[in-house]
């Protein structure tokens, strides 16, 4: 009986480890995320519509594991990037678009805001290398 438990434990640990390793979705470095609108340096009024762009990859909803795809995460006023080896957090500074959305309308307070896109795989983990847009800085009046 003890031997059966050990075999089961080895199988369980191996399966768990394999699922963790599967989260590391590679990109070929040719994919590019970008913010279509608003433009860097733009002065806008709230609400602000942010349009997402992606080339060299496709958009797929969270939970759908498909090569060369992912879904957008909008980083709003973050001081540093999240851990690129873990799922992207979900909070007011890290907005998830797991349904495959390619734009959002945000209510932003007056002032300067920094926007950046980070593509996540089916489990919200960034690709390797990360598919990350340039930082866009806007001013909301």
Positions of PLM-derived features:
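Short, compositionally biased P/S/T/A/G/V-rich stretches that sit at domain boundaries
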Residues: 24-45
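Short, solvent-exposed, Trp/other aromatic-anchored flexible loops in extracytoplasmic proteins
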Residues: 88-112, 118-120
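A glycine-anchored, Pro-Gly-centered beta-turn/N-cap motif
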Residues: 46, 70, 109-111
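Short coil-to-beta strand junction motifs in C2/discoidin
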Residues: 64-72, 132
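N-terminal signal peptide c-region/cleavage motif recognized by signal peptidases
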Residues: 17-18
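Short acidic/polar inter-strand loop motif in beta-rich domains
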Residues: 81-83, 120-128
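Short amphipathic, basic-aromatic surface patches that mediate peripheral association
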Residues: 53-64
């Amino acid at each position: 009986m003890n031997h059966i438990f050990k075999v089961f434990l080895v199988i369980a640990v191996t399966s768990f480890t394999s699922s963790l390793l599967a989260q590391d979705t590679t990109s070929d470095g040719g994919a590019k995320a970008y913010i279509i609108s608003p433009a860097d340096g733009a002065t806008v009024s709230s609400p602000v519509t942010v349009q997402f762009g992606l080339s060299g990859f496709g958009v797929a909803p969270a939970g759908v594991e498909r090569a060369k795809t992912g879904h957008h995460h909008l980083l709003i006023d973050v001081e540093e990037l999240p851990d690129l080896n873990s799922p992207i957090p979900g909070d007011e500074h890290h907005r998830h678009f797991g349904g495959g959305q390619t734009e959002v309308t945000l209510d932003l307070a007056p002032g300067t805001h920094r926007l950046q896109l980070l593509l996540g795989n089916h489990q919200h983990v960034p690709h390797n290398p990360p598919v990350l847009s340039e930082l866009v800085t806007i001013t909301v009046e």
